[in-house]
């Protein structure tokens, strides 16, 4: 039976799917593999460029900001379109190269006058929290106002890339709160994500996420900032502890239940030591 040739559109869809599911720290390896499979750089660049951008935004990819001692985060919350993003801390917009992971062509931008005092106060607290809890952590805080509603968004990213030891991992958390200045309470919503890929003598991925909801009393900028970070700290500590406990339980039960007398690889696994295979451990609070 004659096979129907794969169309360019289908090739782009498949390649884009590979790109979007690249494990943390392994974008370049996946890109090079699909480039070799496709053997058409023009089609790859023109057809899958949206996947490069989406991957970097989904992963909360950190980027170095010229002339500063901090990194910013690439995300959907600071996407200005046409490949440009902005850093609210330095109030600069920039062009971002999604393959080179570099910023260029900086321009000053004007902050949202209503949201900025709240954003700046929360940014200071977030910086201190990230520095004390995440060894290589990067954070960005975004603010915008619509009418009398202020929305603040916190993005936190940390990663450990250890290709020489055959594993890579990333922590991501995003938090949002919308409120009216100086009145009532507001709901703080968060999404926490951990992804680790371990590939020595096998191929194992840990992918975990959790949604959180908390209540915040709204009074002034400093009080809201401190209360939001207190709630974030409690929620993220609880989540990280739960992952560690779950992982230990899996080592003691699930992994042993999956054992075979001799795996398909024909190589025996020391199931009693599988908990030491590094998955998730390096993303715990330092």
Curated annotation (Swiss-Prot):
Keywords: Actin capping, Actin-binding, Cytoplasm, Cytoskeleton
Origin: domain of life: Eukaryota
Xref: InterPro entries: CapZ_alpha, CapZ_alpha/beta, CapZ_alpha/beta_2, CapZ_alpha_1, F-actin_cap_asu_CS
Cellular component GO terms held in the UniProt record: apical plasma membrane; F-actin capping protein complex; WASH complex; Z disc
Main location: cytoplasm
UniProt GO MF annotations: actin binding; protein heterodimerization activity
Subcellular localization: Cytoplasm, Cytoskeleton
Known function: F-actin-capping proteins bind in a Ca(2+)-independent manner to the fast growing ends of actin filaments (barbed end) thereby blocking the exchange of subunits at these ends. Unlike other capping proteins (such as gelsolin and severin), these proteins do not sever actin filaments.
Family: Belongs to the F-actin-capping protein alpha subunit family.
Name of this protein: F-actin-capping protein subunit alpha
Gene (name only): cpa
